Amino acid sequence: YEISACLVGSEMCIRDSEKEYAALVAEYEEVKGKGLKLNMARGKPGEDQLNLSRPLLDVINSSTDCITAHGADCRNYGELAGIDECKNFFAEIFDVDPSDVMVGGNSSLNMMFDTIAGFMTKPVVEGCKPWYEVKNRKFLCPAPGYDRHFAITEYFDFDLIPVPMTENGPDMDVVEKLVENDDSIKGIWCVPKYSNPLGITFSDETVKRFAALKPAAKDFRIMWDNAYCVHDVTDTPDELLSLMAECRKTGNVDLPIMFTSTSKITFPGSGVAAMAASDNNMKVIKNRYQYQVISYDKMNMLRHARFFGDLNGVKEHMKLHKAVLKPKFEIVLNALESQLKETGTADWTNPNGGYFVSVDVLEGTAKEVVRLCKEAGVVLTGAGATYPYGKDPKDSNIRIAPSFPPNDEPVSYTHLRAHETGRN
């Protein structure tokens, strides 16, 4: 990895040290001349991680018994909600009964989109309007957050309301005030464990406050995307309180709709996605799915179920991923620490899991940092992408994804310098 001298035109730098400025320009130009091609824009598993799941491809062959424990033939139609073997280990992740789990295709994002689309056209709760009939409908978007979440609700013409993130998760004072006083607010996006991009895990208090919400809208829903539920990268992993368990205590089991997938466990694009919700929610969701699909890829479900066995099998497999990812995160964090700590030009997260390191540079410089990195051959997530409508009000947040570049790339981090742009 090389992220070099990326903001080198600051008036401050010129005032303080013309010599240092010239040295940074020279260093940056030197890096540009190396012809780097490093992609750190999205949380894609690297080839070394993909190879960990190669044995999955050998689980099913022409002589394999494709009948489930309950007698379903995975080669045929049927089993709208998925096979029991798969539902069982997803139920452990979600902390729900297997009957409240629906196993889908390869994409949890697809299931989230379908869920919003379904609620747009049919009432979530009897007596409520379909969301498309709600004028000035709104959705809460903790930010910085996941750009593809925001894009779904933007596509359906929701007003996206940013909610500040804290070290404990979304600012619950803001969430409670908005949700409990505005019935046009229909939901909130959440990545509760190792959030994208901050790597924060919601505190116990935050989870409990979510479970205790008293929304003005009866059809308000928490879109709980637990994408990184087993994705630790250190030996001190975070623990996430069970939202559904807390909702049972408060009588709010209809609030959350939960999602996850094996996309960053086995093969992205060829994994298995799942969702879970209360009986009431699942009745609405399944009623819509029955018009949409007969069944998803049960052979892939069977392949995954037999490969892992249960949640313990998943956790053992994730230890292999941790062994690959941990040094990659350390490379990024050590570079930031050694090159930027003393400059006062940036702050960054040090997550225990997930796929990202979030860097906050000086206000008004993130776009320029990303642009200059790209010119130097390092592709980062577009500045602003982690905020609704792609607009970071401070132009300061940059998401770094360490997973995709191999460890044998040149590792000579120099200065990721965040200075103000422009020169008089």
PLM segments and residue spans:
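Short amphipathic alpha-helices in soluble, non-transmembrane regions
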Residues: 370-374
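Conserved PLP-binding active-site segment of the aspartate aminotransferase-like
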Residues: 358-364, 380-413
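Conserved core of the PLP fold type I
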Residues: 14-16, 65-66, 72-218, 229-251, ...
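Conserved core segment of the aminotransferase class I/II
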Residues: 104, 245-326
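N-terminal "arm"/small-domain region of PLP-dependent enzymes with the aminotransferase-like
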Residues: 10-81, 92, 375-378
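Single conserved hydrophobic/aromatic residue that forms the stacking wall/gate
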Residues: 1-9, 14, 415-424
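Conserved glycine-rich beta-strand-loop-beta hairpin in the small C-terminal domain of fold type I
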Residues: 319-333, 345-360
